[in-house]
Amino acid sequence: MMDALMGIDVGTSSCKLTVFRKDGTVILTDTRKYPVYYPQDGWVEQDPEEWWECICAAVSKMMADDKMKEVNIKGIGIDGQGWSMIPIDKEGRVLCRNPIWMDTRAADL
């Protein structure tokens, strides 16, 4: 088995996943795009459910790849464009989209 690491980047326009050896050699990479919403002037949002769906789809695709048969993931690093609270209900469902770093609705505060 080859030890490897997985990086997950939840960016402004897409999530990017990369599996790489400890020496930095890339084994696999996948990118999934999701939309940015502009519901009002100055409002810029994304849907956390879409982040999650993209991450899950990319991980599933990568783990099914033949290159992963001899890979042992030793660690996962997660990075994002800017973190914020995600309101959920008691069943864990996301209640609303999240403002992202480009949102200016609180600029006057």
List the predicted regions and their residue ranges.
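Carbohydrate-associated surface elements
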Residues: D103
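N-terminal glycine/serine-rich phosphate-binding loop of ATP-dependent small-molecule kinases
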Residues: M1-C96
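Glycine- and other small-residue-rich loops at beta-strand/loop junctions that grip anionic moieties
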Residues: P99
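Short, intrinsically disordered, charge-balanced linker/junction segments flanking boundaries
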Residues: A107-L109
